[in-house]
Amino acid sequence: MNDYQNYKINHTLSNTNESKQPLIPAATVLLVRDHNSKIEVFMIKRAMKTNFGGAWVFPGGKVDSSDDIKNISKYSPLLNDEEASKRLGIKSGGLIYWIACIRECFEESGILLADNEQKKISKGWFKGSDEEIVNQYKKQLLQGKDVFLELIDKFDLTLSTNEIAYISHWITPKIEKRRYSTRFFIARCPNQLATHDGLEGVESR
């Protein structure tokens, strides 16, 4: 209980005199694993300077324009937009939430939900020089650079969209100034080391 006695969250409340802001599409993922016959979920504590700072959250964030991949079948051969949209209950554009989920998960936790034909990533993280290259891509992503697909192409990967299950849709209450329309997903955490990025996330467990 001591961890929560001084629990504070950085809220930015709405102003009734301001015009309403549109909902921001977002995606987040529950990374779960079996450990000693119990289910564990990875969570990150957001830096106080960020929106909802101080809160413990799942890896995720807003949908980016770069998530709208034109030749998506190359990167997601086992889940297409029609099926993804059907699962979300929308007409089209559903698969973009899966892409955002995977990209944000990698940025915030270092977990890359992707594979190649040898299933190299799901069995363990890159080693040696490959690991250094992957870490450089992550740093560039955190700087706002659009390099996620470069990383995927670099190692000839496909995104594990078919292994990520959609579970819920939450909308931020109207009292908050910045409101999100967030799709929640769940995925088994692969054999990789999950950790916070040290920028938006300052702790993890």
Predicted regions and their residues:
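N-terminal leader/linker segments that precede catalytic domains of diphosphate-processing enzymes
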Residues: 1-205
